[in-house]
């Protein structure tokens, strides 16, 4: 019988490069510049995470164009060790959940337009990449109150988005988008992870969600802004440390901590103050 304590893997950590302009998912992610059809950066998060193993670094090339698609870290494969963490290096990149609204999705009565998003509950309407001003309406308010929406504003009411504008939304590209998928970054059952230098915005629910079983996870110089519900939600038994963190201009919460979740923050900018839920 062989009993060994404190044994860790000696496999060398690698860097996997992701480039949403020049990358290709048939490549191996081993170089920042494309070499040939098989050697060079990958294009998507899914491909990078499929290649990744413990203690690796995923390096996002900041191309100036937002990355689309969510980033999901799960389990042993996307974890590290106390002295050799698994890393996501954003290099100032943006992860965006904005989804263009097809012109055919809009209906109108006069200058009041509406569309029905497939996913309900939290909404965000964007024009030219920026949130439009929102007009608040209660669900039980009568339909006549839709007339109170000011020009250039939008409101959500009974599963629809209403937007008042003189533009013809069903003709030409008005560059309108909604916050699309649920969360930009999801963390579950991971340990010894560092995520740094990126912005997460325009997701339907949360910029970052840690629903459970996370420990020794550090977010450094991360911005979560303009998401539908919260900049970040920590739930279950997750413990997240934030350093130079900014959670601002989100739909309802800057930081939502539920259950036994723990947030350890240093030099954080949160607007409004954090929400602690049972």
Question: For each predicted feature, which ranges?
Answer:
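Right-handed parallel beta-helix
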Residues: 191-202, 214-229, 238-253, 261-276
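Bacterial N-terminal signal peptides
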Residues: 1-6
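Extracellular polysaccharide-degrading/modifying enzymes targeting complex plant/algal/animal polysaccharides
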Residues: 17-210, 233, 256, 274-277
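Boundary at the C-terminal end of the N-terminal hydrophobic targeting segment
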Residues: 11-13
């Amino acid at each position: 019988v062989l009993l060994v304590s404190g044994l860790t893997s000696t496999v060398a950590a690698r860097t996997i490069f992701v480039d949403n302009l020049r990358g290709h998912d048939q490549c191996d992610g081993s170089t920042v510049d494309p070499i040939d059809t098989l050697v060079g950066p990958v294009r998507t998060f899914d491909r990078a995470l499929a290649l990744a193993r413990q203690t690796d670094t995923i390096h996002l090339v900041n191309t100036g164009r937002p990355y689309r698609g969510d980033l999901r870290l799960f389990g042993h494969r996307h974890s590290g060790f106390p002295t050799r963490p698994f890393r996501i290096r954003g290099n100032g990149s943006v992860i965006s959940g904005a989804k263009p609204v097809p012109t055919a999705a809009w209906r109108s009565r006069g200058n009041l337009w509406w569309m029905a998003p497939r996913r309900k509950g939290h909404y965000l309407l964007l024009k030219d990449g920026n949130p439009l001003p929102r007009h608040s309406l209660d669900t039980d308010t009568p339909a006549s109150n839709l007339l109170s929406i000011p020009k250039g504003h939008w409101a959500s009411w009974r599963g629809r988005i209403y937007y008042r504008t003189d533009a013809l939304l069903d003709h030409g590209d008005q560059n309108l988008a909604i916050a699309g998928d649920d969360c930009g970054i999801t963390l579950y059952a991971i340990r010894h992870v560092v995520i740094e230098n990126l912005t997460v915005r325009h997701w339907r629910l949360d910029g970052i969600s840690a629903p459970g079983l996370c420990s020794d996870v550090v977010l450094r110089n991360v911005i979560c802004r303009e998401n539908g519900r919260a900049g970040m939600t920590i739930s279950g038994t997750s413990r997240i440390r934030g350093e130079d963190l900014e959670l601002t201009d989100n739909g309802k919460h800057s930081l939502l901590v539920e259950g036994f979740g723990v947030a350890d923050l240093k030099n954080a900018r949160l607007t409004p103050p954090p929400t602690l839920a049972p």
